[in-house]
Amino acid sequence: MNFTQYSDIKHFYMDTYDLLMRHEAQNVIPLGNIIIGNEGKDKTDWRDSANWFMATITDDKSILLTAVMTTPKNLTLYATDNKNDNIALNSLVDGIIKNDIHIPGVMAEKSLAEMFAQSYAVKRGIEYTVAKNQRIYELSQVNVEIPSIGTVRLATKKDMSFLPYWMKGFDSDCFGDSLATGGSTDNYLYRMSDNRLYILEDNGMPVSMAKISRDLQTVCVVGLVYTPPYFRGKGYATSCVAAVSQFGLDRGFTKCVLYTDLANPISNSIYMKIGYKPICDSIEIKFSED
């Protein structure tokens, strides 16, 4: 097995893009990241590829394992064609440790992430915990029976009177209160600057939001789904996500993709009613300091 660490995003992109595209919906995060890095237009925050860890494991014929970490975020992994190879995985772990790369966490298809975590934790002499069990869904057609409520429109700067609170609420729901207390006006404006954040209004009152967060070759990603607690249980999230998903399909994408937290059965049920179908389970694992 050969461990190759890359310093050039364009080289890494050329070697791995087609492999990741074999499971495009599953790989929306690493694919989206290497597209951002390859374009090089946006180097804010974690998007500067000069700070990334990028590696592949190959045998005599081909790449067996692809790894990319957009520091300081988690490591993401893809076993080519979802064929987990324990020797390849341990070669990656050995290469990471030899090169003194520190991994805060890993997020990947469940069985692969668990294999990596076990090997990495043992060899580092550290502990790990499961941060989130997730499911990846894709949709090719919106259920026409979903009721349409109110009006869905693009968010504007005028919405900054409430959007920071909604985004903090979203972060709190997804990542916990400890990671939802920060944030600046510039950060919130950035999250709506690409004109893909949508607001559902009912009788002129903003009640829910969702965003088309990434464009890939044939799929777009729906995320940042949030309804304030006061407005929950009224069908707003269902209507908003259905409308935004249809916007994505209308733009020419063949599928919409989203991640869900398996600890929230209500949201999983909502998405399946809209027409989303599960394609694989993903897990996020965090490591203790080593």
Task: Please describe what each predicted stretch is.
Residues 63, 70-149, 285:
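Acyl-donor-binding surface of acyltransferase catalytic domains
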Residues 84-95, 227-229, 233-250, 269-273:
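Conserved acetyl-CoA-binding loop-helix of GNAT-fold acetyltransferases
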Residues 35, 69-72, 179-226:
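A conserved beta-strand-loop-helix scaffold within acyl/acetyltransferase catalytic domains
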Residues 1-31, 142-177:
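Short amphipathic alpha-helix that is part of the acyltransferase structural core
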Residues 100-110, 248-260:
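Conserved GNAT acetyl-CoA-binding A-motif
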Residues 4-7, 18, 24, 32-99, ...:
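Conserved donor-binding loop and adjoining core beta-sheet/short helix segment
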Residues 112-130, 238, 263-280:
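Conserved active-site alpha-helix within GNAT-family acetyltransferase domains
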Residues 107-113, 258-268, 285-290:
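Conserved beta-strand-loop-alpha-helix junction that forms the acyl-donor binding cleft
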